[in-house]
Amino acid sequence: MTDSQQSKPKHVMMMAAGTGGHVFPALAVAKQLQQQGCQVSWLATPTGMENRLLKDQNIPIYQIDIQGVRGNGVIRKLAAPFKILKATFSAMRYMKQLKVDAVAGFGGYVAGPGGLAARLLGIPVLIHEQNAVAGFTNAQLSRVAKVVCEAFPNTFPASEKVVTTGNPVRREITDILSPKWRYDEREQAGKLLNILIVGGSLGAKALNERLPPALKQLEVPLNIFHQCGQQQVEATQALYADAPANLTVQVLPFIEDMAKAYSEADLIICRAGALTVTEVATAGVAAVFVPLPIAVDDHQTANAKFLADVGAAKICQQSTMTPEVLNQLFTTLMNRQLLTEMAVKARQHAQPNATQHVVDLIQKM
């Protein structure tokens, strides 16, 4: 290796598009790579949310025109091979122009042509799968990738190149104090149990409509913090209007500081997206997961089982969310010792060093 090659910073091209679940873990890794002196670029789609999320991140974006074909019409499926070929050549052109040394794919359809382009150019590929069930693109790329990272164990068949890393999460989540200390401190201070309901930025209509009637049946004094989405505030507030005196309820359109919300919660009720499950484990919070029933391959149930199978969480399928079932579940969970034990188990199964682990694997390629 020449002196000029030794002095050239490693150039890593990130590939992630479509949803925050793909983009945020990739961004955490990208920022860490930059801090270690790497040059980072990003392969994106022209209209994906990644363009907005990367706007102020000092990461150059290179776009290829690609869309998903899964479940779409016949004409789009027939045109798909030509679109994939065109997108692959576009990605190859960028990679040669930028002299890319390694490629890291985090999902989204952009990663398919990008991974194929890297393979054709002899550039090593790392992929990272956030969910417990591999998405279509990552399932295909796992055959050609040099390193396959999985957030949850056994997502891919056992192999020397498969590494269970966990999902990269934000520093403010990994910095949350231990669950045992937090739960014990609240008990010693005589504080009420805090129930946190999170439906995501848009809210989850099923949670907003079905949880208030069930919670109003509980006789235990509780603080309820219900994040319902901007468009559903009034409707959700109306369902709590006749709440009994033992319930103190705050209905919120969104939560700015999720680290603080996790830290103060005794029980969280939420969907089971990959990053949500990861953050719940990292924070160390007892959880009731309500998997999104329309999630592809029911991957949210698989995500939730990661914590439910070790006693750190309960799973309540949306189809079974009757007032009677919910009341029985919540009555069982209104036990501070049980919630503390669940929270401790959640933290025990967290992988707070996931970001650095993935970065190290990229650096070694």
Curated annotation (Swiss-Prot):
One of its GO terms (cellular component) is plasma membrane. Keywords: Cell cycle, Cell division, Cell inner membrane, Cell membrane, Cell shape, Cell wall biogenesis/degradation, Glycosyltransferase, Membrane, Peptidoglycan synthesis, Transferase. One of its GO terms (molecular function) is UDP-N-acetyl-D-glucosamine:N-acetylmuramoyl-L-alanyl-D-glutamyl-meso-2,6-diaminopimelyl-D-alanyl-D-alanine-diphosphoundecaprenol 4-beta-N-acetylglucosaminlytransferase activity. UDP-N-acetyl-alpha-D-glucosamine binds at residues 19-21, 131, 170, 201, 255, 274-279, 300. Pathway: Cell wall biogenesis; peptidoglycan biosynthesis. It is found in: Cell inner membrane. It holds the Pfam family Glyco_tran_28_C. The keyword DNA-binding does not apply. The keyword Cell cycle applies. GO terms for biological process: carbohydrate metabolic process; cell division; cell wall organization; lipid glycosylation; peptidoglycan biosynthetic process; regulation of cell shape. It is an enzyme of class 2 (transferase). Its main location: membrane. Its EC number is 2.4.1.227. It is a peripheral membrane protein. It catalyses: di-trans,octa-cis-undecaprenyl diphospho-N-acetyl-alpha-D-muramoyl-L-alanyl-D-glutamyl-meso-2,6-diaminopimeloyl-D-alanyl-D-alanine + UDP-N-acetyl-alpha-D-glucosamine = di-trans,octa-cis-undecaprenyl diphospho-[N-acetyl-alpha-D-glucosaminyl-(1->4)]-N-acetyl-alpha-D-muramoyl-L-alanyl-D-glutamyl-meso-2,6-diaminopimeloyl-D-alanyl-D-alanine + UDP + H(+). NCBIfam families: murG (TIGR01133). PANTHER family: GLYCOSYLTRANSFERASE (PTHR21015:SF22), UDP-N-ACETYLGLUCOSAMINE--N-ACETYLMURAMYL-(PENTAPEPTIDE) PYROPHOSPHORYL-UNDECAPRENOL N-ACETYLGLUCOSAMINE TRANSFERASE 1 (PTHR21015). Belongs to the glycosyltransferase 28 family. MurG subfamily. Cell wall formation. Catalyzes the transfer of a GlcNAc subunit on undecaprenyl-pyrophosphoryl-MurNAc-pentapeptide (lipid intermediate I) to form undecaprenyl-pyrophosphoryl-MurNAc-(pentapeptide)GlcNAc (lipid intermediate II). HAMAP family: MurG. This is UDP-N-acetylglucosamine--N-acetylmuramyl-(pentapeptide) pyrophosphoryl-undecaprenol N-acetylglucosamine transferase. It comes from Acinetobacter baumannii (strain ACICU).
